[in-house]
A protein has these predicted regions:
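Short intrinsically disordered terminal tails
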Residues: 1, 227-234
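Collagenous Gly-X-Y triple-helix signature in extracellular proteins
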Residues: 1-191, 225
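Short, leucine/isoleucine-rich alpha-helical interaction segments at C-terminal helix-coil junctions
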Residues: 87, 219-230
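N-terminal acidic leader/helix
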Residues: 186-203
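An amphipathic alpha-helical micro-motif enriched in hydrophobic residues
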Residues: 194-199, 212-220
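Charged, low-complexity interaction regions
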Residues: 202-210
């Protein structure tokens, strides 16, 4: 096992945090979108059959008792970040706006964007996106993911579909992974950091191509040394 920062891990990397197993879906501007590796339990999207995640009973549960349990199992700094998921419906209506949460269900867009690294589950599970809205005659249909990964919809009050929580974590969080899971490639985030450091050191210009190559090699060497140091302090 070795420790690396979440921002240095490859998409699809599985890791444990706060007593639960997560999958890294994507890194974005200092935060990492993560999905529970498994369905945690079966529960209605909303016990009142409302497909608006902003007021759904599943949202209240995930950000209440469930989040409290996660925080109790945090060993070290709390890396959970708040966010505002976009609740635009399947047909493009924006009646439901956004809501402020820490734990949430993936939107359809987040699911589609990261489908290539999301393993199928052994049961159906909810997304936070509604089929349409009450103003359009659909106040009860919410999106779900089937066991083969395909998308469907069903009544929000149905209590036999799973909750598969998602969250944003601070991308500087150190996680433990198997050695062969570590990425050897420079991620876009790393590349940006390298370019910024080079620009600061050389004023954004290089006299020759050799100068650029030398500086870049130095920065990459520093990055590798940092990773090796993290591994030694596992």
């Amino acid at each position: 096992m070795k420790k690396i920062a979440l921002k240095n891990a490859a998409r699809g990397t599985a890791f444990d945090y706060a007593g639960q197993s997560w999958i890294l879906l994507e890194n974005d501007d200092g935060r990492a979108l993560c999905l529970s590796k498994d369905i945690i339990e079966t529960r209605a999207f909303d016990e009142g059959n409302c497909n608006n995640f902003a007021v759904a009973s599943s949202k209240e549960y995930l950000n209440g008792a469930y989040l409290d349990n996660l925080l109790e199992d945090v060993n070290g700094p709390n890396a959970f970040l708040t966010t505002e998921p976009d609740l635009t419906t399947d047909d493009g209506l924006k009646d439901y706006g956004t809501c402020t949460v820490t734990i949430f269900l993936l939107t359809v867009d987040q699911y589609r964007r990261n489908r290539d690294v999301i393993p199928n589950a052994d049961d159906w599970w909810w997304l936070s996106t509604a089929f349409s809205t009450k103003s359009n005659g659909y106040e009860s249909l919410a999106r779900r993911v089937d066991t083969d990964g395909t998308l469907y919809w069903y009544l929000a009050c149905y209590g036999l579909y799973g909750l598969r929580p998602a969250c944003y974590l601070d991308s500087d969080l150190l996680i433990s992974i198997e050695d062969d899971e570590a990425t050897d490639d420079v991620t876009p985030e790393h590349a940006g950091e390298i370019i910024a450091a080079l620009a600061e050191q050389f004023g954004g210009t290089f006299a020759t191509e050799d100068q650029l190559t030398t500086a870049l090699s130095f920065m990459l060497g520093t990055l590798r040394a940092t990773r090796e140091k993290e591994a030694r302090h596992e």
